[in-house]
Design a protein with these regions (language model features):
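Glycine- and acidic-residue-biased ligand/ion/polar-headgroup-sensing regions
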Residues: 59-83
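Histidine-centered metal-chelating micro-motifs
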Residues: 51-54, 72, 98-102, 106-112
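A short, N-terminal "cap"/entry segment at the start of jelly-roll beta-barrel domains
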Residues: 1-40, 54, 93, 138-154
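Residue-level recognition of conserved beta-strand positions in structured domain cores
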Residues: 44, 57, 75-77, 114, ...
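Short acidic-glycine-tyrosine-enriched beta hairpin
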Residues: 78-107
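A short hydrophobic beta-strand segment most commonly corresponding to one strand
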Residues: 63, 103, 118-139
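Conserved short histidine dyad/triad with adjacent acidic residue
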Residues: 41-58, 106
Length: 154
């Protein structure tokens, strides 16, 4: 079949996720497997009660499309040469509102999620697979979101 579709708001396949990647409760619906996409991983991500991602970096580009609520995307610069336990400094804080589309270049240290502790925030995440290894990789860090990125979360 040349075309497959899925409704974002139907009962999609729920992806099991590591809760250590987030600050509070998050659900992730799988889209790419349902439609058979091989060039990118696509998820519909729901952040409850002010939840956001832990600090992380991808080896491929990422696109976020806001589908509900108000969120925030923050980028950081790295201070130091270590793979773990290095200093950070916030470089951008960007409001994410319904309909917004954000492009995050590979290698950008960042976090994103809900800006409201009382309302649900959701977005589509499109992770564009790197052409060389065809596997998208994300490195997650413990962090205070201000000055320090700590240990890598396994």
């Amino acid at each position: 079949m040349d075309v497959k579709k899925v409704n974002l708001f139907s009962n999609s396949k729920i992806r099991k996720i590591n809760p250590d990647w987030f600050t509070a409760k998050v659900h992730m619906a799988e889209i790419s497997d349902v439609i058979g996409s091989k060039e990118q991983n696509i998820y519909h991500v729901y952040f409850e009660n002010g939840a956001k991602t832990k600090l992380h970096v991808h080896d491929g580009n990422q696109i976020l499309i806001v589908t509900r609520g108000n969120g925030v995307l923050e980028t950081f610069s790295k201070r130091g040469r270590g793979k773990e336990n290095f200093g950070i400094r916030r470089t951008k804080k960007i409001a994410l509102n319904l309909g917004d589309v954000a492009y995050i270049k590979k290698g950008t240290l960042h976090t994103h999620g809900s800006a409201d502790k009382k309302r649900l925030f959701s977005h589509i995440a499109i992770n564009i697979l790197p052409p060389k290894n065809k596997k998208y990789s994300t490195t997650w860090y413990e962090s205070d979101f201000k000055t320090l990125a700590g240990n890598i979360i396994k």
